[in-house]
Swiss-Prot record:
Gene3D superfamilies: 1.20.1280.50, Ribonuclease Inhibitor. Pfam families: F-box, FBD, LRR_2. InterPro entries: F-box-like_dom_sf, F-box_AtFBL13-like, F-box_dom, FBD, FBL13/AtMIF1-like, LRR_dom_sf, LRR_PRU1-like. Residues 372-421 form the FBD domain. This is Putative FBD-associated F-box protein At5g56400. CDD domains: F-box_AtFBL13-like. SMART domains: FBD, FBOX. Residues 32-81 form the F-box domain.
């Protein structure tokens, strides 16, 4: 899409269809003049929507008015992949010159995507120039197949940085007690640290932090990952299995104002949680050996998704999930999820939505005759008063799973909608969906108004 078409589409003046793809030279010149009459703020905003700063700078030749417009664009994006090795010096010069000539009062965003030819000194210079222009968001991505790039301590000089997103970077022990006083969003993807203490110091040096995303790998040099942030509201932690098992022992999470929690980690054994009274949503796909502590921290949650394949899931008696409205359980391991379901149903009096799904698609012994012997001793309150939606994806029709389906459909007197999707294959063999559907359709349902569907 050329610039003229881009600008016209933005204004809503033309439709993107085959019949109007060609513009003659006269109409193009007319459109350029017409667009040039737009207010400068609007033109600058339109330019900021172009993919890269190279594209933005290229518009300087459109007309005299456009010569310096690009210097006022508040978002800059650089990617060295568009330069071959022989022209890499041109890329370095282009980035430096673009930052030096930048005239907007605030540099809202700087995105750098760089590879092995880019050095720590190059990054350091660009960071310094960006800090001089009151940068708000900094994104640095280093190509994953070329190792990591060490970042300069100049980052600590920022007073205006609100969002920092790093990928494949090395962070040393360079952080001050209040390094990022304005930072609210921090993304650390496949970052190397100097040790446990560097993580604790880095995160605690962000007193205003609200959103933290951590994607780890097995070479991040951290065993005990501590996240202690008073005002944090959203936390996502992911440990990548791509490079083997990480040498990770535990998480320490102290975030009393957290509202959203998402952890996927099949290797770390322990997690220490402090109370999270404002937590609304939690997604946990973990292998923690002991779960008592984190269940105690989830009592205020409204939406809960659990996959505890390797965990011996237990929590103390007396815990009530009084706000739980939406529960999703992964059914990848019968011996684990059935126990969790039997515990949570009686302790979730307001549960309205129950979803079951085999997310990991593990091997299933379809000839196993084991039944569900962990049913609650009484019909849970949620089944008779609140449960309205029941969905089961990848239903395997084992004896245990059929017992669960029978129990829920029989005792749920408020159900409005039930959707069951049989698994396509079990242990490599195609399932007979017709037989499964006939069996489920014949079951007694406690709710006469429930709509039963099969996907």
């Amino acid at each position: 899409m050329n610039l003229i078409r881009f600008l016209l589409v933005f204004q809503g003046k033309i439709q993107m269809n085959e019949s109007r793809k060609k513009l003659n030279c006269q109409s193009r010149q007319f459109n350029v003049d017409k667009i040039s009459d737009l207010p400068e703020d609007l033109l600058v905003h339109i330019l900021s929507l172009l993919p890269t700063t190279n594209d933005i700078v290229a518009t300087s030749g459109v007309s005299k008015r456009w010569e310096s417009l690009w210097t006022k664009v508040h978002k800059l994006r650089f990617n060295d992949r568009i330069y071959d090795g022989k022209r890499y010096d041109s890329f370095l010069h282009f980035v430096e010159k673009s930052l030096i000539l930048h005239k907007a009062p605030t540099l809202v965003s700087l995105r750098l995507s760089v590879g092995p030819k880019c050095t720590a000194d190059d990054i350091g210079l660009w960071i310094k120039l960006a800090l001089d222009r009151n940068i708000c968001e900094l994104i640095i991505k280093h190509y994953p197949d070329h190792g990591h790039i060490r970042l300069s301590r100049r980052l600590c000089d920022s007073k205006t940085l609100v969002s920092l997103k790093l990928k494949n970077a090395i962070l040393g022990a360079i952080w001050l007690p209040t390094c990022f006083i304005s930072l609210k969003t921090l993304h650390l993807r496949y970052v190397k640290y100097s040790g446990d203490e560097s993580v604790r110091t880095l995160i605690s040096s962000c007193p205003s932090l609200r959103n933290l995303v951590v994607k780890r790998h097995n070479e991040d040099n951290v065993k005990r990952f501590a996240i202690i942030v008073r005002y944090l509201q959203s936390l996502t932690v992911y440990l990548s299995p791509l490079h083997g098992v990480a040498d990770s022992d535990a998480y320490v999470i102290n975030t009393p104002n957290l509202k959203y929690l998402n952890i996927k980690d099949h290797y770390t054994d322990l997690c220490s949680f402090e109370d999270m009274p404002y937590l609304d949503e939690a997604n946990l796909d973990v292998a923690f050996t002991h779960t008592e502590n984190f269940f105690e921290s989830l009592t205020s949650v409204k939406k809960l998704s659990l996959c505890l394949k390797k965990s011996n899931a237990q929590y103390p008696e007396g815990i009530i999930f009084s706000q739980l409205d939406h529960l999703e359980l992964c059914t990848c391991d019968d011996s684990k999820w059935l126990n969790i379901l039997a515990m949570l149903l009686p302790d979730s009096p307001k549960l309205r939505v129950l979803k079951l799904n085999d997310k990991n698609h593990d091997f299933v012994d379809k000839y196993c005759s084991c039944t569900w012997n962990q049913q609650p001793s009484y019909v849970p309150e949620c089944l008779t008063k609140s449960l309205e939606i029941f969905e089961w994806r990848n239903y395997k029709a084992t004896f245990r799973e059929r017992d669960v389906a029978v129990y829920i459909l029989k005792n749920s007197t408020c159900l409005k909608k039930t959707v069951i999707s049989p698994k396509l294959k079990i242990s490599g063999e195609i399932c007979d969906h017709h037989i499964i559907r006939e069996d489920l359709a014949s079951l007694f349902m406690g709710s006469s108004s429930c709509e039963l569907k099969f996907d």
